[in-house]
Every structure is written in C-alpha cells, then in structure tokens.
Amino acid sequence: MSKKTKILYYNQVMDRSGMKNLISRLISYIGVTSASEVLDQLKTIGFNYATKFGISLGIDDLLTTPFKGWFMQDAEKHASISEKHNRYGTIHAVEKLRQLIETWYTTSEYLKQEMSPNFKITDPYNPVHMMSFSGARGNASQVHQLVGMRGLMADPQGQIIDLPIQSNFREGLSLTEYIISCYGARKGVVDTAVRTADAGYLTRRLVEVVQHIVVRKIDCGSIDGIQLKPLKEKKIKNLFGSADRLVGRVLATDLFIDKRCIAKRNQDIGSELAINIINYQKKAILIRSPLTCKSKQWLCQYCYGWSPCYGDMVELGEAVGIIAGQSIGEPGTQLTLRTFHTGGVFTGDIAEHVRAPFNGIAFFSETNLQATRSRHGHPAWISKEDIKITIQYEEIEHKLNIPANSLILIKTNQYVKSKQVLAEVRAKIAPLKEQIEKYIYSDLSGEIHWGFPVRHTSEYIYSNLHTVQNTGHIWVVSGNIKNSNKNLLLFYKKGDYILKDFLNKKLNINFQVYNKKLNFYQKSIRNSKKNINNLINSTEFLNINSSAIFATYRYKNTKMNENNPNIFSETNLNKYSLKKFYNFVLEKNQKFISNNTKIASSSIYKHHIENCGIIKYGSIQIKPFPSNFDQDLNTIKEKIKPLKLKYELINSGTIFWIPEYVHTLVCSRSSILVQDGMFIEAGTEIFRGFFMPESGLVQIKSKTNKIHEITIVPGKLLDSIDIFDNLKKQKFFFYPGEEIIPGIKAEVLTYLYLFGVNKQKNKLLLRPAKEFFIEKLRKNPINLIPIFGTKKDIKIALFEFIVYEDGQQVRSKGKIELVQTCLITNIKKGPYSENAKFFSIDVFFKNLRNRFLNFCFSNQTNFEKMLSKRNFHKNLYFCFKTLNNKNKENLANKKNKDSLIQNKGYLQLLETKNTINKNLLFVSRKNQIQILYNKITKEDLKENYKDINTISKIKKTKIYHTDQQVFTIQSFYLLNKNLGLLGNFYKNKLLFQFIFDYNKIKTYKKDLSLDINTNLLKNKNWFLIDESNNFFQLKTRKNQNVKQKKIEKDIRINLGNFFSQNVVLFNTRQLPESGQILYIEKKICVFRLCRPYLATKNAIIYGNYKQIITSGDNFITIVYERFKTRDIIQGLPKVEQLLEARPLNNLSSNLDFGFLDWNTDISRLLGNPWGFFLSSLIIIRQSQLELVNQIQKVYQSQGVQISDKHLEIIVRQMTSRVLTTEENGPNAFLPGELVDLFKAQRMNQILENSLAYKPILLGITRASLNTYSFISEASFQETTKVLTKAALQGRIDWLQGLKENVILGGIIPAGTGYQKILNKKNSNFLENKKEVSIFVQKQKNIKFNILPSNTEVNKKESIQNLLKKLHITYTFQ
C-alpha cells in the first residue's frame, strides 16, 4: 500500500494579493482548466460563508480614530506658528504654504496609519475594515476619507488649496469644506461622464495605432535588448523592482551569477528565476523587448514573451497589438471613476529625511558647506561633497553618510533628539518641475520701502516693475495720502501734528461705516507760496468741551493687573478726605451718556456663586430702575448680552440661593439611563461615564431628538401620605435646628420643594440653600465736575442693583454675581447734555499711572480764513494746571492764574468765555503760533449729528510712550473726531484735575486734605500718532489693557530703522507690532506701524520706492519652482498628454543635454562619425524607456498594474518614423517628410548618398494617420483628405492589418490557425530558404565591424568593457 502524500496546509489570511498569487500558481502548475475548477470551489465557499456571516455596511460601522483630536490640535498649532513667522517677515507666502501643506499632509498620513490598528483593536470584524483592507472593495484612501479626514484638495488648475478639509464624510462637511471638496472632485457627475468618454476615445486611438501588430515569428534574431538595473533606492522607480515586472520576459544574453550560468539566452523568466535574479543579481541584465525587435510590422515570440492570459509563451498569430491598446485604455475608465470618488486629494511625497537614531551630539565637518534656506524657510546648509555625520552619546557612536547636494538642517556640536531630522536627501533623478507665480497682497495702506538693490525688468524697462536681486524685506509703512486743490491759509511744517479732517472742506462723519481706516495727511509740503495758496481756505471742525476726573496709583516693578485696570472713587470729594475706596471697571469708551447711565461697575465680587440655581428674595426691598444701558452690545463676530440691571436695592436684607446642576447632552433619548422625575442616589450612572454628584431628583427636558437638558435637584426625599397636612403653612425656608414636620429637623438651611400629582401622591424634597446678606450703601451723589461755573450739571452716585428676579432660574458656567455696584450718572438737561460722552485716558509718568475719566460735550465751530496773533496769551488755558502745595481750598472755587508750563510739546488755544468766536492755537516745536477763528451754527450741528444718538463710533489709535525705563504701548480710545494727537493738551476747556499719589494717600489721616504736587508734571512728553486710526462701532465691554515695557539705557537705534514684531529691544520684552522709528528723544521712542514682507531673488515688485498703495493691492509676485503634484485628478489627462507627445513645461533633468553628453563621450572613444551614430541610438532608446516609465508612474499611483511590454509596443509605434532633413541630396524624399525607420535604414545600406534624417516622437493620433494602410487611416479621421492624398500619391494598400481586412470583408490575418493557412500557401516559396539577405549582411557589417579586421582580441575586449560601463551592449564579430 502506497504511503499517503502529505498535504500542505497554509493557515493565513488570503487577501487580494494572496488570491492573486494563488491563481497565478494554480495556472502555472495545473493549467487553466483545473485552475478554473478550483476557483469555482473557492467562489462557492466564499458565497456560503459571506451569507452566513451576513456582512452589511451601516453608518455605525464608520469608526473615527480617537487620536484625531490630538492630531488636529497639533496641526493647528504648527499652522499658527507658520502664520506668525509670515507676519514677522521671516518666511514668505510660498514657504508658509509649503509648511502648511507639509503639516496637513503629514497629519492626514498619520491618521491613515492609525486607522488600521484602531479597527484591529476596537472591532476586527468591522465590515469597512474587512472590505477595504482585504481588497474586496475600496482602498485605504477612500476609507480614510470616510473615518479620518478629507485632507488637502486641489483646485481645477491642479494647485493645492491651503485650507484643508478637517472633517470626514462620517462627521459631515461644512459649507466651505463642501465647496472646496467640489473643486477637488471636478464638479462631480458631469465631469465623470466627460472623463469616461475621454477614456473610451483614448482606447480607440491606442487600438488604431497597433491594430496590425501580430506575432509572426518565433525569433527575429535580434541580439539587442533593454537593460534592467537592480533597484537600490526606494524613491527611484525602476523596471528591476519587483518579480512581476520580470516574469514573462525573455533573456537577451546568458545570465551568470559568480561565474555560474543560471539561465541561457532566449530563456523565458519564470517566478522562481525572477526571485533569484532579484536576490542575487547585482549587475544589470539584458532582456528582449518589442522596442528592439527586428520585425518590420509584427513581433516575434521571444521579443514579446509570455501571454498574460495563459502564463506561457505567446502563440503565433496572436493579435498582441489590440491586446496592448485595450489593456492600456481600459484602466483609463478606472482613473476617471477614482477621480470622482476620491476627489482630487493631494498625494504628494514628503522629502526623504535622514533622522537621528538616538539622542546625542552631532559632529561633522563644515568646510564644504554653504548657507542656504530650506524649502520651508528654515536655515540650512548644502553640502557640495559627501559628508559624514557622527552621533555620539557617551560611549555609543553612530555614523551616517549624507550624499552630496543634500540639505543639512543642524549645526555641528548640536544636541539632537531621537528621530530628529538631520538632513534632506535629494533624489538622483530630479522630478519634473514647473514655475508658479504667487501674488502677495498688502494688508496695510501706506508706502513701499526696501533696502536692497533692485533692477528694472528687461521686458518693461520703462515701467514701475522692479526685479529683486537678493532676498530681503519689503516694508509697507502705514499711511495714506490726501490731495486737495482748495486754498488753505495756514503755515505748517513736516512732522507737525494736524487734525484728522484737516484737509476736508466739511466734516463728513459716516456713522454707518465701521472698520474704515481714516485718511491722514502725510505728504510733505514745502514752504513755497505756490503750495500754500493751493491749500484749503475754509474748514469746519468739531470742538469738544472736555473735562476729566482721574485717580493715580503707584505700581512697582511694572507688576500690576493689566487685565483689570481700576479707578478709585472716594466718598467726600469736597473735603478731600479719603474714607473708602471702591474698585470700578470702566465701561468701553465712546458711549453716549444720558441720565441714569452706567459708566463703571465694581470689580470686587462679594455675593457670587459658581453654579446654576434659583434666586429667592428674602427681606430685601427693590424697585424698578429706569435704565438707559440695558440694550445689547454687539460685536461683528459675536454677540454679548450684558446683564440688565433692572431692580435697585432700597434697603438692606437677605437673598436666598438654591443650587442645582444643569447638564446638556447631545445623544439619543435611549442613551440616558434614568427617567424623568426619578430620585437617584449619589454615584448612580446617568449617562455613559457620567455619575450623580449628589442624591437628588432628576428632571429631563428634551429640546430636540438629540439635545436633552438634565437638571439634578440635590436634596433629601420624604414620601408620606400625611406630609401635606403636617406641613407648616406658607413657610418654605427652615434654618438649622427648626422642625419641618414632626420628627424631622433641618440640618442646614433648607428649602422645601413639593412635587407630585395630587394630595395622595405628594412628595417633599428638602433642598439645601444659601443665604446672602446685602447691605444698602448710604451714598449721596457726588458733584464731580463743575461745568461753566456750576456744580450741578453732572453728578455720579453709587447704586446697588439686584441682577435677577425673584424665582428666576440662572444658567451659567462661570461665576454669577447676584448684586452689582455701579456708578450711575445724573445729568440735568442743558444745551450740551444731549450729546454728552465719556471715555478714559491713562497717562504714565515715572512709576505713576494716571487714569482720567473724561466727559465730553460736543459743539461745532466754523473756522474762517483769517490769521491773527492778537492777545492770544490772555485766552490760553492749560491742560495741567498746578496749585501751590500749601493751598488747601476747594479746587472748584479756586481761581488760579494762568502760567505757561515749561515743557516741550504742543499747546492748543482753548475756548474763551462769553465770546461767539472760538480761537484755536497751533504750536509746533519751533514755536510758530497761528490763531484761527471759528463760528458755530445750529443747522450744521443738527445736520452732521442727526444719527448721533443711535450709532456710536470710536477712533482706535496706538500710543507709544516712554518715560524713565518704562515703555508703554496702549490701545487708546478717544471720542474726539478731529484731533489727531492727544497729549499734554485738550481741544477745549479743561478746568482742573486731581492727582493722587497712592502711597501718600495711605499715610494721610482722615481729616487731612491732599496736596497737589507740581513736580509730577515736569518734563513730561507723550505723543499719539494717528497712522492706525480706525472707526469702530461699540462692540465689546472688555477692560482697557495696558502693557509695560522697560527701556534699556544703552539702546543703539537710529531714526528710520525698521524692527519686526517680537524683536527684543527693551530688556526681555518684545515689540507687539512691527514698526519704523519715527521719533527719538531722551525718554521717548515713537514707532510708525509697518508690515514686513519677505521677497526672494527674482521676485517682481509692482511700484516705485515710497509709492502709496492701498490695502488689498497686489504689489509683489514671487516666482518659485514646485514639483508637479501627482494628483489623482491629473491621471487621465497626464496619460493622454504623454501618449499624444505634447510638450511638458520642463524636460526631466536626465534628458537635458543627454545627446550631447553621449556624443562627446563616445566620439572620444570611437571617432566622430561613429560617436555621433551610437549616441543617437542610445538617446533614442533612453527616450523610449523614459516615456514608458512616465506612463507607468501615472498608472501605478492609482494601483493599476500594466505590463511593460504593452507600453513598449505603443512607444515602438510612436518612434517608428523619422523626419528627413535638408542635408539630403537628390533622392526620393523631400525635407520634412516622414519616413519609416526600417525603410530609411535599408535605403542607407544601398544608396551611395545616405539619407539624412532625425528621430521624431509622434503622438498616437498622428501615428494613426501615418501607417502603411491608407484604408486604416481613412477609417480613423479625415477620410476625404486621406483618400485624396493617397490617390494623388498612387499608394497601394497591401491589406496587412486587421482593420483594413475587416472593412473589405477579407480574412483577418491573425489568430492561432492563420499561420497554418499562410504556410500552406507559401510552402514552395519558403521551403529550404536559408540564404541571408544582402541587406542584413550589410547591416551587420556596418553595425558591428566597427574596428579594423587586424584589431587584436584584447583590444576588442577592452573596448567592450568600456562600452558596458556606459550601459551600451554590443557584440564584436
């Protein structure tokens, strides 16, 4: 009895590649018939188990990776860093775009990598995971867009959109993301239909080119072939890379491994031999190819190889041309469909990086390094030669070899971390590049400045276009220009501060426009009569009567609360004694005030709680308050609804707070584990992962099907039938120790909460409560500012308000203030009270900070065109009036004499009493004083301020102020619409000010009055420049923040210097804005706002130096190179572009000057004529192989595998024609005529005057119209033209192709049985014919007998070895 053979058992998962290998082996070992039976059994088993398992795809099967949120946060952080560096001017827009693309592409790839482990861990039998990763349906990219992120998209031009789609299809896309997604998907179904038609037309053209190619011979006798090199680098796609690209080919030479022959010439390569070649062969091998077949219009078996259908040598008569055309054109439809499904997702490769293996110190030589910038704008060094980097950690040492022309991203002796990028290695074969122009738009209006050499472009030598010669910064200095043709009788010089509407004829304030930058006059005007006469002669101004109250406090070492600046209000202002301080936060500036308007609120919270609950009034008494400030204050981006102070506190009393917990859940109702009205103990799970914090009642309110609000009412539950009768009537609060019902006493302050259906089912909940005692302030109104000799025009009083109503439920996540203390105005009606406004000003001097609370009353005056210098000293008021230190009288009744302040700066003539005309004084730094007269009319006031009560405007201005090592940059808000500078002066009358020293106030006794210190105002200069003036609506109630910076003593800066944002100039503090130094004094440094833009070499600047541009103008164009994106959307058009031989933007670097290089090298070896001939052959062969590789890359990027032999057949027909040149003598061809390559070669073997021609690459359409058959050409395109031309030329169609025989109804010259019929007809002609044609003999002599006959063998071998080094394979006879 024979032994039973052992059956092999493979216990492994059979995915798509595994099934592919199984089918291939079955066909190889048992044949097609038996393999089909085995596969039928596999199919039956698969259907059976798929039916039992019941696989279906649902929306819940799409599981998002839990790490996505972390990846998104990290990517957003990197994107914000790139944005900051672009704003600082360290990188330009292109480098920012590259960083952004790199960041989001890496994030997308990490998400894709985490997708498979997440499925395997959480749900290994997930239908999405099984279908995609087994290869049954879909791929990783499509599943990644379902559960990961959509990623970066390409626009219709193929450029990457810098806004990534962070959502996936499971989460859903926003409107913006959907529009971008439509860009990438190329408009969906319509485009898909168009691409499908294009794919069909591509298949028709491909079949048209090669329809006549049939296998006719077994061996054509060719000894030439194409070389395949071993694959060494992962980035270089080579034909030697995998066994699939070797299987089915035929060797052109014998194959040796270590002097042992493992395969002979004309031997086909099977799977085992292919694996051995890949593993052991280190040199290039030569294989047969359709490109080198000697047959004229057909192919031989050896040059074609295996048939892809049967896994054996192709049979004679096989129509391999049609098979090749269809195999290339059919995946074009797949490219189209995948374009629609995946939608233009960016799939670019990240540069190949060299990373550190472990932590340590890097050492390398810096002798041959040259400084440069990486493509992301980081500093880098390029190495001209190979460099060795040594990583050393303690006694461990590791060496890395970096090839030449690589970017080194670290310095020597630098500590590096594990996996840190050390260098970027460039590929040996540079990919195709294209030049792109990036337009840069200005963010500011202003002048263009640059400090590097530029030149005019050669195309526009007389224009304002300039080309940047070296990389540098272009600065836009903030500003605008205002030209006018009117006459203004006024004298001023460059640098003087002027009113903002100085050049306008009328004051036009548009209250409906916000975020509009104001114009200011910046152009320097010379002191010539001609320019002065052209200025405006009449201007209308808005004068504002300003008064102020302020307090001063001391801060040490610049440590103060910047986010909450306070003002201090003292109880009895008339006696100047300090009893109590209240900290108040001012409301936002520019608010129009009326009677009962809140101007400040207390910053000290006494009665606040931190959770939700219910308000219950105790013994307090309230009354409604007629508030004028309860309207909503809105911003552009968000709406803020402030608390409405409705109820004024009348007397002291108590208020109760009953806490509860409120949570909002977004889930289905079934996910909530408790029911409405249930009493739950502490620790009970309410929702997945959420537990009860305390025992209490649960109330559930469903807003929608997915949004539910859960209210947890803490307390103790009492359930008794007699509970309602035993309760004390009309009492709901019980203090600790009081009896609630017989036998139950309150442990804490308790509130009774009754709930139930009726008396029989009443339940009682004992809820904990809090009690607050609120004390009523006994405060009389304060006469803050006497206006026009009176003290009762405006008053400010302290009020306390209850914010919430009795029984109101309060919902808030933060602190809740129950009672608020506010400053309320009390203004009597008068001529100025309707347009009263208030704002605050902070003034810094040494270590004192002065806060001014200013009240403004508007009136309008009209300046006449007259100049006067009369008696201006008598009418001059000063901003800072001084009193004697010994003076203790009431400031309101004090009549102080005017005296000039001995400090530098600008003074202004203020309003005089009892006069109609108002005087205005301008004082420049050279003490040139002019007085202008003005008048006021009621009509102008009504016309210009008709909307003044409905819409409020403020002007935002930057102040740069320094004083004794304190550098302050403050966002300054003022209401003066005309004054461009606010410093040690005001527009109109300022009667008095109070200055309090905070430290001195603490030491004073209660009855002592305060002294006014005159030394505080000595040598005080501060300026406000209006380059950043803006109109804004009242949008927010945020506090005004002040930033302090210290100035070092030795700062070497000059006028006109530019400084970028975050540059450290003053100790360790950084500049908050970029700017140019405009003014320097001993203690002051004024910056003009700027914006830097980095421009690279050869960038184009639109405009001249100091030219004015507006915001949004395109003023720089950066020209840069980028790799051509291997985008899915470009699959089918890219294939069509290659097959039609359309020129690309740039040639690949390995083809540049390739012919000249080969010609030079071979001419040096073999002489000029032979060198020229051989270099032509080699460069043609190289071009053919490069075209095959380019087409393969497009298909391989989509996962489509096409046999190389099919592409080689197509390329063979594209290069089968040559173009005759004008160097020909008298022969049968004209210059520029297309001739068959084989025909030209045979003619040159006979003719004495050889035919001069050059190779040409024809597209498939043009090649289809230049074949041997005019019937085939006429059936393809241009029927009339082709037939007419053929008739004139007398062409004969020998009906050798398939198409022409189909048209005429003849026997198709193809098929496995056609060769027998052909052999039977021509048996007499072909019998015993062994003579060699004279043409073949002549060709062999020319091609291979290059050296003289007496050349020695050793010389032949040396030349042959040299040619092999140049990758040329020839055999000498």
Curated annotation (Swiss-Prot):
One of its GO terms (cellular component) is chloroplast. Its EC number is 2.7.7.6. Keywords: Chloroplast, DNA-directed RNA polymerase, Metal-binding, Nucleotidyltransferase, Plastid, Transcription, Transferase, Zinc. SUPFAM superfamilies: beta and beta-prime subunits of DNA dependent RNA-polymerase (SSF64484). CDD domains: RNAP_beta'_C. GO terms for biological process: DNA-templated transcription. Binds 1 Zn(2+) ion per subunit. It is found in: Plastid, Chloroplast. Zn(2+) binds at C220, C293, C300, C303. Gene3D superfamilies: 1.10.132.30, 1.10.150.390, 1.10.1790.20, RNA polymerase Rpb1, domain 3. It comes from the Eukaryota. In plastids the minimal PEP RNA polymerase catalytic core is composed of four subunits: alpha, beta, beta', and beta''. When a (nuclear-encoded) sigma factor is associated with the core the holoenzyme is formed, which can initiate transcription. Belongs to the RNA polymerase beta' chain family. RpoC2 subfamily. DNA-dependent RNA polymerase catalyzes the transcription of DNA into RNA using the four ribonucleoside triphosphates as substrates. This is DNA-directed RNA polymerase subunit beta''. It comes from Chaetosphaeridium globosum.
